[in-house]
Amino acid sequence: MRGTLYIVAAPSGAGKSSIVNATLARDPKIALSISFTSRAPRPGERHAEHYHFVSADEFQGMIEAGDFFEYALVHGDWKGTARQSVEPQLAAGHDVLLEIDWQGARQVRQKVPDAVSVFILPPSRQALDERMRKRGQDSEVVMAQRLAAAREEMLHFEEFDYVIINETFDTAVSEMCAIFTASRLRRQAQQQRHAGLIRALLD
């Protein structure tokens, strides 16, 4: 049985990574695909754990070689998912989660129409502003640019199957887990997973 591909996107500062990490800790059946990026690591980020950090030239080389499942220019830096991180795992029956932006999500849905997509929204603009400022990693100019970009990203929430409002962290994680559980109970998935039982019941 082929695995399920999950897409999770959100504007910067909405708490996407924290929710994803907490959800994966509860649901070990899903593997997180580590994205490639051409941007420099932020304080505390480690290569191959948070991202695969490569130069812009290396990223362009991977694009030309057709190595990416999806890629996009995000906040002036390239981000992408390697084919090798997704296709073999799905074919082997493993569920894979992509933590990407809306541009990459649109590309993925074109290639995998049955992918399950989730968009995370902050509870308010003020909360988004406060969360981004707490990071303390960007100048005021960069912060203003990121807030403007976040508002642009939120316009695309209607392209996703599910929407989570991250007002209370534990609730948001529980809602994410519920989405994963529900997707596994879809008729098509259950029909494949329990084909023998269904045949026995209906014969």
From Swiss-Prot:
Protein name from the UniProt record? Guanylate kinase
| Record's keyword annotation contains Magnesium | no
> Which is an annotated Pfam family here?
Guanylate_kin
Question: Got a GO cellular component term for this one?
Answer: cytosol
Q: Which GO terms describe its molecular function?
A: ATP binding; guanylate kinase activity
Domain Guanylate kinase-like as annotated: residue spans: 3-181
The gene coding this protein: gmk
Annotated residues for binding of ATP: A10, P11, S12, G13, A14, G15, K16, S17
